[in-house]
Structures are given as structure tokens and as C-alpha cells.
């Protein structure tokens, strides 16, 4: 029996809706990254993007354990010498709550062109409203 290898044109992708309210950031992100990669499917193939689309709502209600709200830092560089900017989890949630989930999930995906294609299938919204009702996403309890 030959080993099955999925072909990009034959991959069936579903849309899922995840409610992040009250969920722990890392546990949510690891399951979302797993589904974006397609590792939950029997036809998973490492070199083909077999993952599903994930829509996350209520990103502003995600939580972290312990003192991470004050201690977890996010860094970025502006491009100017000495302009390393930093903010903690609470400041990031005030400024852009969806970015915290995006950073967590992106860090769990492969760092190559395939990983960037997988990340494009993630849609994160701070509130309960999203613009993907036409795709009829199925509710997914994580």
C-alpha cells in the first residue's frame, strides 16, 4: 500500500468559529495552531497546507495565568537606532486585543512560506461581530 500524500487542489477546508472568552491564551493558541496546520485530519501531509479556517471572536476576553498580565512583554523595533519598544500583556490588550492571540498562534506555526500561508487562514476579532457569516462557520468548543 502506498503512502497517501495530499494534493493542494484536493484539500477540503472547513470554517470554524471559536469563542475566546474566558479561555487561557496558550491553550487556545496551541489548539488553533494545530487546526491551522491540519494535524487533526487523517490526510495531514507536512509539505501541504491541509488546515482549516479559524475565526476567533471575543479576543478581548482571553486571559493569562499567574502574573503574566504584568510580566509578559512584547517587543518590536521601529527601525531606528536604539528604538526598541516594549509593552506588557495588559497594554497590548488595551491597544489591540486581537494581536495577543495572533502573536501566540504565529509563534506556534512553522517559520517558512507554508507557515505564513497557514497564518492567513486565522481571523481574529475583539468583539462578538465578525464578517464571515457567509462562510457559515461551525462552532468549535476548545
From Swiss-Prot:
What organism is listed for this UniProt entry?
Thioalkalivibrio sulfidiphilus (strain HL-EbGR7)
Any single Pfam family the record assigns to this protein: Ribosomal_L13
Family label: Belongs to the universal ribosomal protein uL13 family.
Subunit info? Part of the 50S ribosomal subunit.
Q: Which Gene3D superfamilies match?
A: Ribosomal protein L13
| InterPro entries in alphabetical order | Ribosomal_uL13, Ribosomal_uL13_bac-type, Ribosomal_uL13_CS, Ribosomal_uL13_sf
Protein name in the entry: Large ribosomal subunit protein uL13
PROSITE patterns, per this entry?
RIBOSOMAL_L13 (PS00783)
Per UniProt, which keywords does this protein have? Ribonucleoprotein, Ribosomal protein
PANTHER family given in the database record:
LARGE RIBOSOMAL SUBUNIT PROTEIN UL13M, RIBOSOMAL PROTEIN L13
Does the keyword Ribonucleoprotein feature in the UniProt annotation?
Answer: yes
Q: What does this protein do?
A: This protein is one of the early assembly proteins of the 50S ribosomal subunit, although it is not seen to bind rRNA by itself. It is important during the early stages of 50S assembly.
Give me any GO biological process, just one.
Answer: translation
Q: Which gene encodes it?
A: rplM
Give the GO cellular component terms, alphabetically: cytosolic large ribosomal subunit
An example molecular function term from Gene Ontology annotations: structural constituent of ribosome
Keyword Cell membrane among record annotations: no
